Amino acid sequence: MRLVLDWDGTVTVADSMDLIVREFGDADLVDRYSDAFIDDSKPLPVTLQHVIETELATIKTPLDEVVAWLLEKVELRPGFLDLVERERPLLLSSNLRQLIEPVLAHYGVEADLIANELVADDSSGWRIQIDGEICPVCGERCKRQRLPAGEITYVGNGYSDRCPALASSRIFARCGLARYLDSIGAPYEPFGDFHQIAAALGRDA
């Protein structure tokens, strides 16, 4: 069974995309969209793709400066470095490859990665490329469409993890993803760090 991990808020303690938009872009926009995605009682006003594109377009700082700042701020969840050596998971993220790869390199991590692409970082604002077809289940260009074939153990925490998690055989969830799964009665295993996940996977090996 392939282990697939979300990045922001799952591997990282804090959402690194939110961090950089707050520092280099429009922090008020982050708050506005975060409130909308947290409130499960109301339909979402926009797609996740729109949120990502709009937030990142407010950043006008060159990528290398943002990466240098991020490497000083980002914190990885306890147990991740040990787990990634043992399992070599797939990292599946709505964030940008150009922001994730430097963090992995900084920590000496080798892992398979699927993420979105930054195509411009000039003074007119960052522009990105999100590939994939519209998902027939959720109606977005979601991460379900990029899951590998076969049985999946999925680990996630937020809105972008809902659809891929529900397509997986086993789910480890926290925060918003856990609340969503509770609301629809879907089974999952809660986690706080990757030591707990490693222990659960070890027991079932």
List each model region and its residues:
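Alpha-helical substrate-recognition element adjacent to the catalytic core
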Residues: 1-108, 112-115
